[in-house]
Amino acid sequence: MILVIDVGNTNTVLGVYQDETLVHHWRLATSRQKTEDEYAMTVRSLFDHAGLQFQDIDGIVISSVVPPMMFSLEQMCKKYFHVTPMIIGPGIKTGLNIKYDNPKEVGADRIVNAVAAIELYGYPAIVVDFGTATTYCLINEKKQYAGGVIAPGIMISTEALYHRASKLPRIEIAKPKQVVGTNTIDSMQSGIFYGYVSQVDGVVKRMKAQAESEPKVIATGGLAKLIGTESETIDVIDSFLTLKGLQLIYKKNV
């Protein structure tokens, strides 16, 4: 079995693969302060509930956009799993040709998503990832990572309304009953929900106009199902795209 770990700014997602099958997965709040021992105790609790033991894991692969966490995570892997983890970054084979001005600027999560999209859905493709930031990545018909778009995430915008507008409450992100709200909460939910649906469709349509052929659009991330089901442009919703990409990259490098 292999353990795949996707460390995002808001959430950390873990999965366990048995060959090609994702048999367990968990979503945790990202914590920058934990030691390797604290991480190990968290993972042990999850494993106990799933009937797993540390020695069941033969390999570990990590994608992270939070550098301060990496030392503790690496030490946890070595101390408790007796495994040196594979870290997505320079020197790791992905098969991806990145056409960014500076390829080092492309986040590990975006690389992993692109690899998964190519392998599972073909190319050209656009990957929309609803994370702390909402990212859009274009893989062109030459199988190249052609570039993308980065926008504020849904949670960032929602929290900004709450913190910067003194009379507006903190709200749950949900699809409202109708577009025109008749109270503050419904109106805010409508603005957030339909505003982001419209953002996705607008950005994707403009990216498609720049592409040389028609790309398939894949959505992933914590809010992919909520926004993706209302979108006119999203073709596939794959909540586990990043975990699948980590497993695919691990296979390419062992």
Curated annotation (Swiss-Prot):
Broad class of where this protein is predominantly found: cytoplasm
Keywords, sorted A to Z: ATP-binding, Coenzyme A biosynthesis, Cytoplasm, Kinase, Metal-binding, Nucleotide-binding, Potassium, Transferase
Pfam families: Pan_kinase
Mitochondrion found in the keyword field: no
Protein name as catalogued: Type III pantothenate kinase
GO cellular component: cytoplasm
UniProt pathway annotation: Cofactor biosynthesis; coenzyme A biosynthesis; CoA from (R)-pantothenate: step 1/5
Residues that coordinate or bind K(+): 129
Keyword Hydrolase listed: no
Example GO biological process: coenzyme A biosynthetic process
Organism: Halalkalibacterium halodurans (strain ATCC BAA-125 / DSM 18197 / FERM 7344 / JCM 9153 / C-125) (Bacillus halodurans)
Annotated EC: 2.7.1.33
Example GO molecular function: metal ion binding
Cellular localisation: Cytoplasm
Co-factor remark: A monovalent cation. Ammonium or potassium.
Family affiliation: Belongs to the type III pantothenate kinase family.
Biological role: Catalyzes the phosphorylation of pantothenate (Pan), the first step in CoA biosynthesis.
